[in-house]
Amino acid sequence: MVKMGEVWTNTGSALASLVFIYTIFERFFPYRLREHFEPLAQSLIGFIYPYIQITFHEYSGERFKRSDVYDAIQSYLSKDSSSRAKKLTANTIKGNKSIILSMDDHEEITDEFQGVKVWWQSKKHQSESRAISFYPKADESRFYMLKFHRRDREVITKKYLNHVISEGKTIEVKNRERKLYSNNPSQNWSGYKQTKWSHVTFEHPATFDTLAMEYKKKEEIKNDLIKFSNSKDYYKKIGKAWKRGYLLFGPPGTGKSTMIAAMANLLEYDVYDLELTTVKDNTELRRLLIETSGKSIIVIEDIDCSLDLTGQRKQKKDEEEDEDETSPIEKQMKKDQGENKGSKVTLSGLLNFIDGLWSACGGERIIVFTTNFIDKLDPALIRKGRMDKHIEMSYCGFEAFKVLANNYLDAKEEDDNELFDEIKRLLEVEEIKMTPADVGENLLKKSEVETKEICLKRLIEALKEEKEEAKRRIEDEEKKKKEEEEIKRKKREEKKIKKEEKEEKEENETTMKD
């Protein structure tokens, strides 16, 4: 009787011989000849190894964006990883209230679907390059490998993969936490496949109910946002990218950032806070846009201060002139220390970011610009079609005050009629200008013993002080204006006297010659 050990030994020797013969065959036989033997060789290999493998890369080809299929598979496998895998990776979600376990690198688990057994492997490929790299992660690539028997090909390709993607996306929605993103400086990207955005959990409590603004204006903005979020088919019908632009303008402290948070909470969108000064050029700006997801608000705060779009040519020219006078060592030091310090994003690049071809990548995005000085912005940047809705965030009016009083003190007009009437007179009749931020600070209780009456009276005193301060500012401005006019008058007189002296001198010289 043949022993089992001898059987495995003979089988192993046969397989090794086949592999050796196949290698010689591929290397030395002409391609035309191999074409005739290829089907036979594949049949033989299939008989010995009847399994099929499908690879799902994290990044495919030259795409900048991470594969949605890869993400869906990762979410799907996390469902069973905790009970089947031996090596796990833990991630927190929803404010660290729960933990998601997923397969670690080089781990394998099994799955079953309609009686069909499959194997999933999580793999990471490390480049074998021996070159020293300051950014080793740039040479890594991750992928999932699915293995199944060839007899189950139809079930896997037509049913199982669709099941995995569908279930994975459902799990993604269930575990989704809204995030606040910030773009990383480009020198830290370490290759285009690295993280361009860092994020934290978005937990801002602002809502339209707590926003200090007139009720009618708030409802108008809310209706506009809700209409946009439900208009995918409409935007497709009219041939426009599914996006909308909002320009928030007004003095500091009028609630522009709070408005953005309220918008995100209303629509349950992520927020991308884009810092333009860290973006090197238009190409990097496009890459950042590609990495944003749908259902998101892309914010550029203080757009008038983010980039000097009008003065870049002069700055570049000055730098080129200075470069000739710089030694090679100094040039390299400047390059290492501040290569990305000066952004080369242009106005045309920013406009293309808003409504060019690249703005159509993805969908359901809101782009928000904020500024304290709308007059400083290029008209091309804020025209309708780019910034579709202009929202002025003004000083606190009486309607906005009532919202703040209710938020901070649970105070209502009918309960504190006299104090409310005085505040109404100061805000509407006296037209005293105070930002919602300053009003809120005066309404905030500073200790447990303070009552709402004390806080309301403190606000009244602050409004009266603001009135006096406004008068002083006007007087100072008038005084300064008069002083400037006096200086100009004296300069004109001095100029006139010098001119007369010059003419008199020339006249005397002419007389002496005669």
Curated annotation (Swiss-Prot):
Pfam families: AAA, AAA_assoc. Its EC number is 3.6.1.-. Changing K256 to A/R: Impaired ATPase activity. Keywords: ATP-binding, Hydrolase, Magnesium, Membrane, Mitochondrion, Nucleotide-binding, Transmembrane, Transmembrane helix. Its cofactor is Mg(2+). CDD domains: RecA-like_BCS1. Residues 311-342, 467-514 are annotated as: Disordered. SMART domains: AAA. Disulfide bonds: none annotated. PROSITE patterns: AAA. ATP binds at G250, P251, P252, G253, T254, G255, K256, S257. The chain crosses the membrane at residues 7-24. It is found in: Mitochondrion membrane. It is an enzyme of class 3 (hydrolase). Expressed in seeds, specifically in the embryo. It is a single-pass membrane protein. Induction: Induced by abscisic acid (ABA) and abiotic stresses, such as drought, cold, and salt stresses, in an abscisic acid (ABA)- dependent manner. This is AAA-ATPase ASD, mitochondrial.
